């Protein structure tokens, strides 16, 4: 059994989880800040889960050899916390534990309906923080947010063990032909992308009626968009998010161009200069 939770009720269930740990494959929780920044963060995010209790439960679960997958989603409120969180996990010895994983995500607004724009940071902003982590980067630290820049971060060895698998010309795992992953709600409705879960217009069908073994999910690449094929960034963004493109293609296109150009200026050009040992 895989358990995914924001962790609010985890402290109350810890005893049962430990007792039944033999049937639990992983517990995925979210920790977006350390205790000293907790009160400041929830004023804006409105997401309350007691970080001190979550950290204590994480320690307990790891002790009993339960696989714990900690996710941290970064935005403007907590980006400065990336290195402190890393050092906290490092000092606790978590990166040397086989049953610990840290997955790093990015807060976004794929459907342009959250009104959260001013708090969203770019892929490049997070990458610049990750690049400050001492090498070698732990193998159980996983980026889960690199999409626009992934084809280039792979070549620069800056993908930080990116966990989702995406095709070369595909924006993310959701529109790639590889991972056959689906989300199921309490009515057995199927969804493909985490952003779409709970939204009726994105239901793929019902588990009672669909043969998942033979179901072919929709794929999408920049080759499906005529505008991408003449774009000056040459399709490197892989066409952007399909959900965003369906709502406002021009807006998401401008966002992807801005992301790509920021990556070029802040990371790619300095990295190439460093590798060529040139300063001009």
Language model features with spans:
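A C-terminal junction/extension of Radical SAM enzymes
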Residues: 97, 108-199, 236
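Flexible loop/turn segments at secondary-structure boundaries
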Residues: 9-11, 36-37, 77-79, 109-112, ...
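A structural signal for well-ordered alpha-helical scaffolds and beta->alpha junctions
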Residues: 51-54, 82, 119-130, 224, ...
